[in-house]
């Protein structure tokens, strides 16, 4: 059997031996060179021919030739995961692989995109015109958007859009996280009940998803982290299709400052930076790509979380500590309504401007409300549930505090509308989420006499101003939260 023919690749004053057959097999550059009959090789009187290369780095060329000598196999290549995360190694290797057109190596990189190298690989894919690698990096960065934002290299890629209508990389990633299917997800301490279509085995799940076509709830293939079990009075908000659960208190009455985020695209929980202040019974609001933790039990300060730094910083505090209030974002501002000050009912609507870091008195109300939930659509705030106490001369008599109502407040016209009420459903301790064309509400049926909190599930249609009742929620439970998240389409998982 004849010995394998070798070729020497010369770069400056160094030579690297490589199998000629493997070189032709793996490198489109050399395959074209040999097939065209071109002769750039120097053939000495004794020994293998020598191919001269210029302009490449020695470390990058060595890595590519090692890959070629390994027959294009990852197992025999010898490059570690740590080396694949080093920017200098990647830069020199991709440069050499692109020049020599070693497509198998470039294709291999598609499956080795990691948090430590995704930004550098994305940059290199742009430089060397590698669309498949660029797409692989974009997909990875969409999956782990907030973790990628924290990377120190990320700001270096944020070049301004080249033409009107173009989006920055950050905006493209943010929008791509919303391309799945909007799904209602419920979290809580579920105590039992016949989960459709089959009862669960063992411990009850702590996360459920709602399938609208069948009107059934199914266990989500994940559970709350142990640190979140038995936590009450926490703040929750959706930011960039992450569900944040922040603060609260344990059943031992100890307040906490911990923060966690659930990524529905990867179905993972991550712990993020803790707040500076332990707080419970506060409001967490997402606005302008940041989170604001507002007030709390006997607390007036406000903290802002920036996912790009994974850090909380204090901003302008509330004018006064508030209890049993609610807050939401509307057109880039935060509105706080209802509750109590340390001395009296809070009849003021407070507005916070993030850019000015300033709280102002927006308007004074004739109706006092507490323990309500709030969501917004365009310039309209919807107030769901809570306890109403009308103070004006036209107030209604014999009004039950514990019934489900929906009101709206237009922040432009400053007009209140009393939209709908449901006297058989409780307006207290409910949870709701804006989802598609309505507000989905998990409430309690006040006509049932039971010690268990059996929840009812209904929807207020914003456009039709009507209630729509669904099949009874399939589990008893408490400490429930309902949210609307984008889950990946089945074809993409």
From Swiss-Prot:
GO terms for cellular component: Cul3-RING ubiquitin ligase complex; cytoplasm; spindle. It comes from the Eukaryota. One of its GO terms (biological process) is regulation of microtubule-based process. It is found in: Cytoplasm; Cytoplasm, Cytoskeleton, Spindle. Pfam families: Kelch_1. Substrate-specific adapter of a BCR (BTB-CUL3-RBX1) E3 ubiquitin-protein ligase complex required for mitotic progression and cytokinesis. The BCR(KLHL42) E3 ubiquitin ligase complex mediates the ubiquitination and subsequent degradation of KATNA1. Involved in microtubule dynamics throughout mitosis. This is Kelch-like protein 42. It comes from Mus musculus. The gene is Klhl42.
């Amino acid at each position: 059997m004849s010995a394998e023919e070798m070729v020497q690749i010369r770069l400056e004053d160094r030579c690297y031996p490589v199998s000629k057959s493997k070189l032709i097999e793996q490198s489109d550059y050399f395959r074209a060179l040999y097939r065209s009959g071109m002769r750039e090789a120097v053939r000495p009187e004794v020994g293998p021919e020598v191919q001269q290369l210029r302009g490449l780095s020695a470390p990058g060329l060595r890595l590519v030739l090692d890959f070629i000598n390994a027959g294009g196999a990852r197992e025999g290549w010898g490059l570690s995961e740590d080396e694949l995360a080093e920017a200098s190694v990647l830069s020199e290797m991709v440069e050499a692989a692109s020049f020599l057109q070693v497509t198998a190596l470039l294709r291999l990189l598609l499956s080795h995109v990691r948090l430590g190298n995704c930004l550098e690989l994305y940059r290199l894919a742009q430089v060397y015109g590698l669309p498949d690698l660029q797409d692989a990096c974009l997909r990875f960065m969409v999956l782990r958007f907030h973790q990628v934002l924290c990377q120190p290299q990320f700001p270096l890629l944020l070049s301004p859009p080249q033409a009107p209508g173009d989006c920055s990389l950050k905006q493209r990633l943010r929008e791509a996280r919303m391309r799945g299917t909007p799904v209602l997800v419920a979290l809580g301490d579920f105590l039992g009940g016949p989960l459709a279509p089959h009862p669960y085995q063992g411990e009850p799940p702590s996360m459920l998803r709602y399938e609208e076509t069948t009107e059934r709830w199914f266990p989500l293939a994940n559970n709350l982290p142990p640190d979140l079990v038995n936590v009450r009075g926490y703040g929750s908000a959706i930011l960039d299709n992450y569900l944040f659960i922040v603060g609260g208190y344990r059943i031992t009455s100890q307040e906490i400052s911990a923060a966690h985020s659930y990524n529905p695209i990867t179905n993972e929980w991550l712990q993020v930076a803790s707040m500076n202040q332990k707080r419970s019974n506060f409001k967490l609001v997402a606005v302008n790509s940041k989170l604001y933790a507002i007030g709390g039990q006997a607390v007036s300060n406000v903290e802002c979380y920036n996912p790009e730094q994974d850090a909380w910083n204090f901003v302008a505090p509330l004018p006064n500590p508030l209890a049993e209030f609610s807050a939401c974002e509307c057109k880039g501002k935060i509105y706080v309504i209802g509750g109590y000050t340390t001395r009296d009912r809070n009849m003021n609507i407070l507005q916070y401007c993030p850019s000015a870091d300033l709280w102002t008195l927006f308007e004074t109300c004739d109706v006092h409300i507490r323990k309500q939930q709030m969501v917004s659509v365009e310039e309209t705030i919807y107030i769901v549930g809570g306890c109403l106490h009308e103070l004006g001369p036209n107030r209604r008599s014999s009004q039950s505090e514990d019934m489900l109502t929906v009101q709206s407040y237009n922040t432009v016209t400053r007009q209140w509308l009393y939209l709908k009420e449901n006297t058989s459903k409780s307006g207290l301790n409910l949870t709701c989420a804006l989802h598609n064309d309505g507000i989905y509400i998990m409430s309690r049926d006040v006509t049932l006499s039971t010690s268990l909190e059996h929840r009812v599930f209904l929807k207020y249609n914003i456009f039709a101003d009507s209630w729509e009742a669904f099949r009874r929620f399939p589990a008893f439970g408490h400490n429930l939260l309902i949210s609307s998240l984008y889950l990946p389409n089945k074809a993409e998982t």
